[in-house]
Amino acid sequence: TCSTGTMRPHAEALGRGRDRAAMIGPMSPVPHPSSPALSCDALSGDVVRLEPLTPGHVPGLRRAAEGAGPNAFAAVPTPDEVEDYVARSLARRDAGAYAPFAQIEAATGRVVGHTAYLTPRWMNGGRLFAVEIGSTWLAPAARGTAVNPAAKLLLLARALEGWGVDRVDIKTDARNEAARAAIAATGATFEAVLRAWQPSLAPGEKGLVRDTAMFSVTPPEWPRVR
């Protein structure tokens, strides 16, 4: 059983009176800058299971990637690119500050996509106070289903209740209306369009920067979102 670390007061309040173990699973250690890897066990719900990414997920991700791209605004691998994509994700994980998952449809056991924690931020070298959910893509058959919102809830629960962060970022290319609608549907709050915020991930836009639509969830909003 993983240790929980010290929970923030707001995280204790959010979980009080309600058994959240079924949602957030066994607790991983709270990340700390002295050991900043965003390690996390599998997260399971009724709709989707998020398994820490391994090379064993490559065949399933290849099938999930069939017909998934090219995406107009995001980096989605083709089936032939999946093996290298997984290798890069695992290299980022091993370097710290990145925790990739394979998304598994609970009803069928099929791999239907990829998602991750990234961009951790530390309070004056101390506790983790913010993290991002991103690097998300889904097989065409899983888009528009309950998989994406269910996965987001699992990740939000672990970050807000388990790690006790003060903020979770979710962002997308400002031009991606479908992704913006999907993020808003999770209950995340739209904050702003950040101009020229980061390099574009859109095909054919290497070397260009994009405007980014920024959303977030904070502890006071979590009871409504969950």
Predicted regions and their residues:
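Conserved acetyl-CoA-binding loop-helix of GNAT-fold acetyltransferases
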Residues: 144-158, 181
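GNAT-family acyltransferases
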Residues: 23-145, 158-162, 197-198, 203-226
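Conserved GNAT acetyl-CoA-binding A-motif
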Residues: 161-171
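Conserved active-site alpha-helix within GNAT-family acetyltransferase domains
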Residues: 176-192
